[in-house]
Amino acid sequence: MALPPPDLLTCPDCGPGAALSTGAAAETFACPRCGRTFGAGGGVLDLVPKSVPSLTEETVRQFGDSWSSHEYLAPYQEKQFLDWTAPVGREAFRGRTVLEAGCGKGRHTFHIGGYGVQRLFSLDLSDAVLIAAQYTKAFPAVSCIRADLLRIPLADDSVDVAVCLGVLHHLQDPQAGLRELWRVLKPGGTLVLWVYAREGNGWIVALVDPLRKGLTSRIPTKLLRPLLLPLSFSLFLALKLLYGPVTRRGERPVGWLPYAAYLGYISKFPFREVEHIVLDHLCPPIAYYLSRPTLEGWFAELKPATFEFRWHNRNSWNVVAEKAAAGRHE
């Protein structure tokens, strides 16, 4: 792994004002304030806080098992990444210091690391970050860190680009997570966000979400996965026999077919990806569906220089926001 310079790292227990220093042993860092030492193993620097809320721990465990059971890279994942980050493209990462907040198994880390970044911090609280470290061990600019996104162990104004895809809505306090992302972003930097939308997901909020909260999220992921196989296979058949042909694999809008924009989009995916999508929607204890007015209110508090919303597949929000440059007041 690429060990980051200690002046960019902060103690997750003491907060942003507590910069770490190089530890006495190799590949370790220490907090001069509390005396805690942090080490690396398996290519991952461990900067997890001493205490994490139990609901967060359970969500992390469920997701970690989900990602670890779907350990693979595929070419279509890069297209999906670029769709989620549009209009920000590959060149926006070149020569920049980047934070990937919530990297999971590293399916996006692998691509960002190949875009010529100056440095990439890929953070995740789950054990899946160990897989991300293996995927990116050939990239000297990538640092994989096990950390809590509600206490990002980076200094203020330390990254040029922050990317958080499909993760903010799984935090116990999504607004606090957004503030943390904004804190570490440099003035003039860019935040790219993708979250579940409340708009367009009424049937999920009304029918699927209660099932997740009351039942499926309480079943360990390793047991839940085989139980969901009939549902996953039924969805896969519907995608291949109906949604794919009718929508031309997501290229043609169809108003009469329910949830057509999203299901047409994922109709091109293989079964293992569809099965993973089903599992990801039903395994986590924490999941929020965020409305545009809610997100606009949160961003208004941050006073960005610019921010742009895009309704992706009519069921999720992509947000690109620029932090005001130093001395600039909107």
Residue ranges and their predicted role:
Residues 92-93, 156, 178:
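A short, aliphatic-rich alpha-helical micro-motif
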Residues 219-292, 296-302:
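Substrate-binding/catalytic lobe of Class I Rossmann-like enzymes that use SAM or dcSAM, i.e.
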Residues 2-150, 288, 294, 309-330:
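Conserved N-terminal segment of class I S-adenosyl-L-methionine
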Residues 175-187:
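A short glycine-rich, Lys/Arg-flanked "PGG" loop and its adjoining helix->strand segment in the class I
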Residues 160-172:
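A short SAM/SAH-binding and catalytic strip from SAM-dependent methyltransferases
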Residues 137, 172, 186:
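Short conserved AdoMet
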Residues 150-161:
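A short acidic, Gly/Pro-enriched loop at the edge of an enzyme's catalytic core
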Residues 190-233:
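Conserved class I S-adenosyl-L-methionine
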